[in-house]
Structure formats: structure tokens, C-alpha cells
A protein has these predicted regions:
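C-terminal interaction appendages of subunits in large macromolecular complexes
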Residues: 1-168
Length: 168
């Protein structure tokens, strides 16, 4: 906002250097190319993926476990565990077990059936079959001039806000 007040003709590319977003209050990894980010902020419309954050931990006999440490915004941990358990019972996932070891931090542990299962392929399959990966839609609807609903990009939204603050 300060940048636009000082220099109203600031190009979108400069605004994008300042604004790192999207910023969501919980964890997960935002999957969004720079081109798609530019499109969303220019048009006010688009979508992006949020994947859960995970890592593997080695255990005995060459085995490993997948540990989910962050889940996407507005996703219920219990629902994810239920989805994983259903996939295990329906034999859609090569997992032996899923455990919730969470305390104040999220910790969902996935135990593969054997050590030969590729961890990246396993996680990709979990993302595909559960809410460990979800798609978010962006739709920047605002009341233009306080009256007319309209979909605007980032710069027009900020300009509208600056004009509103000048009037109030």
C-alpha cells in the first residue's frame, strides 16, 4: 500500500516482489508457479495446491516411516486419518498402519507394508487419495467504489482501498 501511495504506477511485477503470499495461517506447502501467481494477482482468479509437509524416519531393519508434520489450511486431522484408514482397509494404499502421535504439533505416522515401497510414490498416492493435498480457489471479489461487486486483481484492489481510506 505504501509503495502504491508513493508511486501509483508501480508495475505488478514490483508489487509481487513485496507481496510474498498467499499466506495461510496453518502449515503445508503451497504449490504455485510464479506464472500462476502472477495470473492470480493480475486477474483476481485462479487456484493452487497445498500439500502436507512430510519427512521420512529410519527405523530398524532398513524400514522407514513417513511422518506428516503439517496439513493444509482448514483440513481436519481426524478426517485425514479416517481417509487413510479407509484406504488401508480397501487396499488402495500399501500401508500397514497409520498412527496419530500428535500433541500440540501435528504428527501423523504412516508405516509402509515393506521397505521396498518408494516413499515419494507412496506419499504422492496418499496426496491423491486423501486431503493431505487439496486445491484452493482464489476469487478476489470486492465492492468497487463501495457499490458494485466486481472481480479485481491485486493492484486495483489496493488502489480501491487507498481511495476508500482517503475518503474516510
Amino acid at each position: 500500500i505504501i509503495k502504491l501511495i508513493k508511486k501509483p504506477n508501480t508495475p505488478d511485477s514490483e508489487l509481487l516482489k513485496i507481496l510474498k503470499g498467499p499466506d495461510l495461517p496453518t502449515g503445508g506447502e503451497i504449490i504455485l508457479s510464479n506464472a500462476e501467481k502472477k495470473k492470480i494477482y493480475k486477474t483476481g482468479f485462479g487456484s493452487f495446491l497445498i500439500n502436507s509437509k512430510w519427512h521420512d524416519e529410519k527405523i530398524k531393519n532398513g524400514m522407514y516411516e513417513i511422518v506428516i508434520s503439517e496439513i493444509p489450511f482448514q483440513v481436519n486431522k481426524v478426517k485425514i486419518i479416517e481417509q487413510l484408514a479407509n484406504c488401508i482397509s480397501q487396499k488402495k494404499l500399501p500401508l500397514e498402519d497409520v498412527r496419530d502421535e500428535s500433541d500440540e504439533n501435528i504428527r501423523i505416522v504412516l508405516k509402509p507394508k515393506n521397505r521396498n515401497i518408494d516413499k515419494n510414490k507412496l506419499v504422492d498416492l496418499c496426496f491423491k487419495l486423501t486431503d493431505l493435498s487439496i486445491k484452493y480457489s482464489c476469487n478476489f471479489n470486492v465492492l468497487e467504489n463501495g457499490r458494485i461487486p466486481k472481480q479485481l486483481g491485486l493492484k486495483p484492489i489496493l488502489s480501491q482501498f487507498i481511495n476508500f481510506r482517503k475518503l474516510t
